[in-house]
């Protein structure tokens, strides 16, 4: 399909720079096949689901993946900014760096800011290799959990580019950019649909007979990238690591067999569930990378309902929701959202989408 079909104009005032408080007070646009759009709030979610439905949340935790440092040991010491995007092993990370032209294989970058170092000493990394578009492979001086601790001490919250271009990250983002489910470190971006949940909402859902299950997909920086190819068939999807336990898979399969719906909280949960689904719709245990790319024409096997935020033009995520509900339906829904002041992107409002081949 032509990528331009998924483009739209978004006024800057519709981009949220901070979340609402409390989290479940965010607006939520309900999109059902063949029904009028409904303007609700996230707190209404229990009334929109049914006993036996099963929510699936992503429990990945965002790391302090934004690092600032200087190249050392080769004359001038230019400032280097790095965003960690994918862990390769205990000491090696793939990263996006600026300015990449200042680095060569073999160079050493010392990370920290304002003279700050981690408790274990300087956090140094050697450039092992350079790729295209600012990508480098960094080999750090620490390994495993020790490296994780060092990154947490000198790094900063990696805000999405559409927020970072407007303001710097601050202490509030440390809390705001984690979901209440965040427990497994490894993401460089938040699974943002989960940001809307509160303990009170979780309790209300349980009281209505709605189950809740955790899976893990470590969200990568590629989630923010627009599709530059003119045709979707030419786009190369980024890979992300995910896990679904055997117990969770069995519970979801049993609930669905009993008539319950699978409600994915976020596109990351949906992509992982669909990656683990068999042709008959049953979900298998999963522990692997997935680079699933969902566009209109895809046959959904595992997910019946999707709760998700509002996404970027020409993004793989807008393509995904268009596959889920139909392109015409989502174009109309987004036009309504823009016209009525819904807040877009990571800190923005939510939508609740019912699959276009299922009657809710």
Swiss-Prot record:
Its EC number is 2.4.99.17. The keyword Nuclease does not apply. InterPro entries: QueA, QueA_dom1, QueA_dom2, QueA_sf. One of its GO terms (molecular function) is S-adenosylmethionine:tRNA ribosyltransferase-isomerase activity. It is found in: Cytoplasm. Keywords: Cytoplasm, Queuosine biosynthesis, S-adenosyl-L-methionine, Transferase. Pathway: tRNA modification; tRNA-queuosine biosynthesis. It comes from the Bacteria. One of its GO terms (biological process) is tRNA wobble guanine modification. The keyword Transferase applies. It catalyses: 7-aminomethyl-7-carbaguanosine(34) in tRNA + S-adenosyl-L-methionine = epoxyqueuosine(34) in tRNA + adenine + L-methionine + 2 H(+). One of its GO terms (cellular component) is cytoplasm. Its main location: cytoplasm. Belongs to the QueA family. Transfers and isomerizes the ribose moiety from AdoMet to the 7-aminomethyl group of 7-deazaguanine (preQ1-tRNA) to give epoxyqueuosine (oQ-tRNA). Monomer. This is S-adenosylmethionine:tRNA ribosyltransferase-isomerase.
């Amino acid at each position: 399909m032509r990528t331009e079909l998924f483009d739209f104009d978004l006024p800057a005032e519709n981009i949220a720079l901070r979340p609402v408080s409390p989290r479940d007070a965010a607006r939520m646009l309900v999109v059902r096949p063949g029904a009028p759009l409904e303007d609700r709030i996230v707190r209404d979610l229990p009334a929109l689901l049914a006993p036996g439905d099963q929510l699936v949340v992503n429990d990945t935790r965002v790391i302090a993946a934004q690092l600032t440092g200087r190249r050392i040991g080769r004359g001038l010491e230019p400032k280097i900014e790095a965003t960690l995007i994918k862990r390769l092993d205990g000491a090696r990370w793939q990263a996006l760096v600026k300015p990449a032209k200042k680095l060569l294989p073999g160079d050493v970058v010392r990370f920290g800011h304002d003279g700050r170092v981690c408790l274990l000493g300087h956090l140094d990394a050697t450039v092992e290799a350079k790729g295209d578009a600012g990508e480098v492979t960094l080999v750090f001086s620490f390994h495993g959990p020790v490296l994780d601790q060092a990154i947490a001490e000198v790094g900063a919250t990696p805000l999405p580019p559409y927020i970072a271009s407007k303001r710097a990250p601050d202490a509030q983002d440390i809390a705001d950019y984690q979901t209440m489910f965040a427990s497994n470190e490894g993401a460089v971006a938040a699974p943002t649909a989960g940001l809307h949940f509160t303990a009170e909402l979780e309790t209300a859902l349980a009281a209505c007979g709605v189950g809740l299950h955790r899976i893990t997909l470590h969200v990568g920086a590629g989630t923010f990238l627009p599709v530059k190819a003119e045709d979707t068939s030419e786009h190369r999807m980024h890979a992300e690591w995910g896990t679904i336990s055997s117990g969770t898979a069995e519970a979801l399969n049993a609930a669905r067999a009993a008539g319950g719906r699978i409600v994915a909280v976020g596109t990351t949960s949906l992509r992982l569930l669909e990656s683990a689904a068999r042709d008959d719709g049953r979900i298998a245990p999963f522990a692997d990378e997935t680079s699933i790319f969902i566009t209109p024409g895809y046959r959904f096997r595992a997910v019946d309902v999707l709760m998700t935020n509002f996404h970027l033009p020409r993004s793989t995520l807008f393509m995904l929701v268009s596959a889920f509900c139909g392109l015409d339906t989502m174009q109309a829904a987004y036009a309504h959202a823009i016209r009525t002041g819904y807040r877009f992107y990571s800190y923005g409002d939510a939508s609740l989408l019912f699959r276009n081949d299922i009657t809710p």
